[in-house]
Amino acid sequence: MYKYYRLARHLTWYKDEQLDEKEMELGRNLCRNEAPFDLVLSHTCPYPYEPTDLFLAGLDQSTVDSTMERYLGEIEFNLDYKRWAFGHFHADRLYPWADGRQMLMLFNENVVNLDKFMNMTEKQSFKDIIA
């Protein structure tokens, strides 16, 4: 509901809802110095994984700020990780495997068994990792 309230009033987002440049640089440093990562959790997704089929119809996407998605795209491209999970788009989706890595979009209607997610194989589906 909050999203539609904001959109009706032409309010896109508030500055403190996103990382600032200093915080983004901290993330880049973590990627360079602390990899590999077993699991990445983020609110939104890396840009290449944006589910365009879930975008709001009638909303000019050129007016939508994609700073965080582009930043996470940079992180994802440069990061050694096994699994990545995000929400934001209010849907459940298990993306196709890429280089032994798995991307998962979650909504609050399902609970994923973290152990099953971390140990899943390419032959398994979303239903196999539900708690």
Residue spans of the language-model regions?
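Binuclear metal-dependent phosphoesterase catalytic core
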Residues: 62-63, 73-78, 89-131
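A structural signal for short, well-ordered beta-strand segments and their strand-loop junctions
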Residues: 39-43, 85-86, 105-106
